């Protein structure tokens, strides 16, 4: 498996309290995951409608996290990917997510790594034009700028 235990530990330090708070019935348990990805205060800064949706769907997110963790693809599996791949990360993303992007880029043959400066984990909502342009470039087969 492609591993980076230092950065992987960052995810574990978030998911433990997240799962515990959710199990205790804490309505704001999702703060752990949202602020992990977006930085402290991200959940509080979201519009009430978005925040309400996040709270209402926390159980689904916890199930997603608990069923997909740990996901450890082998180096051989990643190196066998034989399709054009663009790995996108935000310049302000959590260090663990930036590292995952680097590992994917290094392991998938011919993959492009694109960093969107000023963005974090929530790129589709914070940088929709940049994401749309990258998708268009990828579909058209032109290199990302």
Language-model features: where?
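Conserved strand-to-helix beginnings and helix N-cap segments that scaffold or border functional pockets
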Residues: 8, 97-101, 125-129
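Conserved serine/cysteine hydrolase catalytic core
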Residues: 50-106, 112-115
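Short helix-adjacent coil turns
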Residues: 17-30, 126
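Flexible "cap/lid" loop of the alpha/beta hydrolase fold
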Residues: 1-22
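Catalytic active-site module of serine/aspartate enzymes centered on a nucleophile-bearing elbow/loop
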Residues: 109-145
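Conserved alpha/beta-hydrolase catalytic His-Asp/Glu region
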Residues: 24-65, 72
